[in-house]
């Protein structure tokens, strides 16, 4: 089968998949867990615990703060130390719940067995029941965007879902958490996909995987034939070319079903597709079949100078410094700590930042990789235009943001930028294109929100 890909732009950064074949280990419990109240797109959560309260693993500690929101559950047992502020993966101080860890006592409602539960054995699982369980468990997109999953499964009346696409691309350099998840929990992922299809009331599913993961392609192709071969569902594993940002939602839809998602506010379901990360499919299985809220995730801890980079199943709230210590500690010399990968990750100033729902990687860049080169004047080469997967003009958007020409920036479609970093990666003048565009995009989106609220 010929590998597919998206049609506009794209780059080929060095993979650096250092932990590709490193089996996942379970990270030890932290001494203290930190839970930011905003771990998703939408309204922050509201605490339902207070200082001195006892909690177990799986206890609700913060309820959804609005329709677009997702509850947060404790990943540890212990005592609530305080409700305070702490630096989260955005780099800013945000409200959080801090819990002192005592033992590892779980809520009795959680099924901790390894038995694989199948959808056909649970007739009570109507589409509505599936969506409710996903919502109540706080499941969000695990690829980094953290959009509440239940909302994607209930599109507006103006849009009709035709298929579910599982995003198993993992095109960001260094990160291998999704790959290890596929190799270690393929059966659960496919049950999760079936639940997503049933919840969305569709019978067609796709799993998009880049060709640099042949073992995962072979394994999931074989499993799909076994699971869905004689069922009413049609599920296909789609090999995709190695090309960044192949895992971008709109790029994935273009590659898999050959449909292009229009500019915002359009979303993939407007062209018939619901896109969910492979980690989300696994979390959906856990939530629906095991009554297990989202409180842990697969995370890669990596860097060229780390002594022992690895993949870990991590309880949310665990400080990054605990994981770095497991890998041999912070390397000597200049280092840059990222929540995420080198293309879209956020640079951090503290190792005390906790693992949250969207933290797919803790990446440490060292030496020259940790230092930015001095920006030079734009040489008008248009390389940034050629690689932009959204067909934008990054040099222009960056300049408009720099001079605060918000009206023109909106006209030039700055809100369509997916912040993939391809422009900045390819710029021979080392200009901070993404930095400027990201700031400008946030400003323009705020202007649009205020205008629509009037």
Q: Where are each of the predicted segments found?
A:
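N-terminal, Lys/Arg-enriched amphipathic/low-complexity engagement segments
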Residues: 1-48
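Short, well-structured beta-strand-loop connectors
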Residues: 50-63, 82
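Conserved hydrophobic positions within beta-strands
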Residues: 78-80
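Acidic low-complexity segments
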Residues: 87-147, 158, 214, 227
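Gly-rich Lys/Arg/Thr-decorated short loops/hinges at beta-loop-alpha junctions or inter-strand turns
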Residues: 164-178, 305
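Histidine-anchored nucleotide/phosphate-binding helix
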Residues: 183-198
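Hydrophobic alpha-helical positions that pack around
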Residues: 202-320, 326-333, 341
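Ferredoxin-type iron-sulfur electron-transfer modules in oxidoreductases and energy-metabolism complexes
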Residues: 359-375, 385, 389-454
